[in-house]
Structures are given as C-alpha cells and as structure tokens.
A protein has these predicted regions:
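C-terminal active-site subregion of NodB/CE4 polysaccharide deacetylases
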Residues: 2-116, 123, 154-168, 173-175, ...
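Extended, charge-rich helix/loop segments that form flexible
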Residues: 40-47, 51, 151-246, 370-383
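Short, flexible active-site-adjacent loop segments at beta-strand->alpha-helix junctions, enriched
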Residues: 53-56, 145-147, 254
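Residues within well-ordered alpha-helices
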Residues: 80, 128, 236-239, 301
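Acidic (Asp/Glu)-rich catalytic clusters
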Residues: 85, 131-135, 235-252
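CE4/NodB-like, metal-dependent polysaccharide N-deacetylase domain
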Residues: 108-109, 121, 129-142, 184, ...
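Long, hydrophobic, well-ordered secondary-structure blocks that form the structural core
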Residues: 116-158
Length: 400
C-alpha cells in the first residue's frame, strides 16, 4: 500500500529520516555520480519518461477519497517539472524516441525528460494543462476512448471506491456477500487493504471477470459511477481536442482499459485498433503513441501495437531507457505526491534522489519491474499449492 501523508508521528519520523538520507546523499554528490554512470550505460544521454495520472488542487482531500498513488497536487507538479527542467531539456515523446534511436555514444549537452499522463482524467485538461503551458513543457496524454465523454469511470476507480466503502463499514472482502462467482474471484485476490486487493485483481483477472467483480461490488455498497469522487471523471471529446490544440499529444490507451496480455489476440487487436480509429476520427489524425494499461505487455502485444501503426509505446517499468532499445517498450518512472514530499512539504533533496534514480541505484528503493515479469510471477503464485505463503510483493499502487 502507498504511504499516505497522514501527518501521524510515525509518518513524520519516516519522512524526516528519508529526507535526511536524501540530503546527505545529495550533499555528497551521489546524484552526479549516478548520473554519470547511468548516462554511460544509456549510450550517452539519459532519457527519463515520467508518468502521472490525476492532478488535483487539494492532494489531501483527494487522497482521502481515492487512490493516493495516482495523485499529484498542482503545486507539486509544477515544482517537480521546474526541478527536472533545471538539469534536463523538456521534450516531446517523439523527440525522446528520436534521441534513443541515435547511435550509442552520441553526446548531448543535457539529458532529457518527457511528461506523460495516463487514463485521461479530466483534470489533465482543467489543472495540468495551464501548468504545462506556463512551463513550455511538451506532454502526452493517453486516453481510454470508450470512456471519453461518458459518465462511466475506470474499473480501478470503481473497485477501489467500493472496497474502501466496505472497509469503512468494517466488512472484510471475504465477507462482502457478493454473488457466488464474483465472491470467489474476490476471495482469491483479497489482501490487506483496498489498494493491495485491487492490484491482485488487476494482475489476475481478464477484463470480463474484473468488470464482474466491479459491478458486484458497486451493487453491494450502492455506488453508481456518478457517485464516485468528482476527480475520477474522465475527459470529454471537447477537452481532448483542447489538449491537442494546447500542444499536448494524445495517445492511445485502449478502448476499455483492458489488460492486454489477459485477452485473446483478436480481442486485444480490437482494443488497440478501436482506440486508434476513434482518435483518428475525432482528432483528424491517427495517434503515434500508445500506453499499455497498467503497463502490462508481452512480445505478442508489442507486435500488435507495431502492426497497428504505433511508433512508440510506454510501460511502467522503472529502469533506464537505453539507446538501441525497443521504442515499443519505453520505461517510465511513476511519479506522484509522495515522490517528493517531506514532513514539511516539498523536498528538493528527496526529489533529486527519487527522480534521478539515486535511491534505486543504491538499492534503497525497489523499482517497479517490467510487467511481463510481474505477470510471470503472478502465474507462478497462482500455481502455488494451497496453504503455502507467498513471498513479499510490492504493491503497484506504491509505484514511484
């Protein structure tokens, strides 16, 4: 589960220690040493792709009613991009792809960073766009075309809201009282806390089964999609067009936010092609960029994305991008409020160590792995004999 900024003594102590370590590392020049090493390993230039989801004016209020690890406040977003821009050039995803296609060893005066937003939340237009314009920051927003302009919400927001409501009522998931099939699916994925349970449901269940659980949970607690927090609203087509007009590239994120490796090849193709065609029709040109829902991808899925005309695709693997790598498997760092949050507010030292990969390089943070590995681990766990305890697993909700 993500570490919420709850202001508790325990949280303050943990954050203060983390900021102190970050300050010492920055003072010692660890970020410069890591940067030099990683730049050499990457082929002469570091290309950082950062991933955001929702942008809110009030992080604490939004975190009380939704997935905290998908949130960043407007002020923090601005400071993160300003800090990144002091040492890197802010470039488009297309430029990042071009730089990575250069021969290894090609020198650049500065490293680069490109900004992405997943899922197509409405606040990317309402809150993030003015910040991007003010900073002159190119960005790409990946949208779920089947939900654009509707009152429907994303499956993960629906499930999280219902699980959180059950928790508030003191009802554990295994006693939710869902219809038999849905309850069995929930029982198999239940973990401590709504976010961890949600992670397991997404990792294990194909889209029809995931929606079955979402519908059953919503009915159980009496939550319809419009009842969910206002911040979970998705873009409408006018807002999507306004993003494009404002200099934000619009990329594909499937029709329904289906986890593609769970689907038969034909349906996966329809999810990708349907998204591409809707964007081409609504925006006047086909999208060039694609984001795998939840970062889950396989070689077969990547081939589909390439066959359908996409030039670049992004994952959620937190690792360095290297020259000569697959442009359909670019790595990204998931960034949210806690990435740079100290007990007294924004921490430049913590931002440096997290955004520049210092903690990861020193083994102080476990990075989000490539999702094809995560899927393999899920399959292995699924086959584990009953009663055998699984090893520790880092929640996807805590990524970044």
């Amino acid at each position: 589960m993500p570490e919420r900024a709850d202001g508790s003594p325990r949280w303050i102590v943990r954050r203060a220690l983390k900021v102190a370590v970050a300050g010492a590392l920055r003072a010692a020049g660890a970020h410069r040493a890591v940067g030099t090493l990683r730049r050499r390993q990457a082929g002469g230039a570091r290309v950082l792709v950062v991933s955001y989801h929702r942008v809110t004016h009030d992080y604490r209020a939004s975190a009380r009613e939704g997935l905290a690890s998908l949130l960043v406040s407007a002020g923090t977003l601005r400071r993160q991009l300003e800090q990144l821009g002091r040492t890197r050039d802010l470039v488009s995803l297309a430029d990042a792809r071009r730089i990575l296609a250069e021969p290894p060893g090609t020198a650049r005066a500065r490293d680069v960073v490109t900004v992405t937003f997943d899922d197509g939340y409405a606040d990317v237009h309402g809150v993030a766009l003015p910040i991007l314009r003010a900073l002159g920051a190119p960005a790409t927003a990946f949208v779920v075309t089947g939900l654009v302009g509707t009152a429907r919400r994303l499956p993960h927001d629906r499930i999280y809201a219902a699980l959180a409501e059950l928790t508030a009522r003191g009802i554990p998931p295994e006693r939710a009282g869902l219809p038999r099939g849905a309850q069995a699916l929930l029982d198999a994925c239940a973990r401590a806390g709504p976010a961890a349970t949600l992670d397991r449901l997404i990792a294990r269940l194909p889209q029809p089964r995931l929606l079955e659980v979402a519908d059953a949970l919503a009915a159980r607690v009496g939550l319809s999609d419009p009842d969910l927090p206002a911040g979970t609203r998705l873009l409408d087509w006018d807002e999507v067009r306004a993003l494009q007009a404002g200099g934000v590239e619009v990329g594909g994120h499937t029709v329904t936010h289906a986890v593609l490796p769970h689907l038969p090849a034909g349906r996966a193709r329809r999810e990708i092609a349907g998204c591409r065609d809707a964007l081409a029709e609504r925006l006047g040109r086909p999208p060039r960029a694609f984001a795998y829902p939840n970062g889950y991808h396989t070689p077969a899925v990547r081939r589909l994305v390439a066959d359908l005309g996409f030039q670049v695709a992004v994952t959620t693997e937190d690792a360095e991008n290297v020259r000569g790598g697959d442009p359909l498997a670019l790595r990204r760092k998931m960034v949210w409020e806690n990435t740079t949050l100290g007990p007294a507010g924004y921490s430049p030292a913590l931002a440096t160590c997290n955004l520049e990969g210092v903690f990861t390089a020193l083994g102080l943070v476990r990075p989000v792995p490539g999702e094809w590995r995560a899927l393999a681990a899920a399959e292995e766990e699924r086959a584990r004999p009953p009663g055998r305890s699984p090893g520790p697993r880092r929640s996807r909700a805590a990524a970044g």
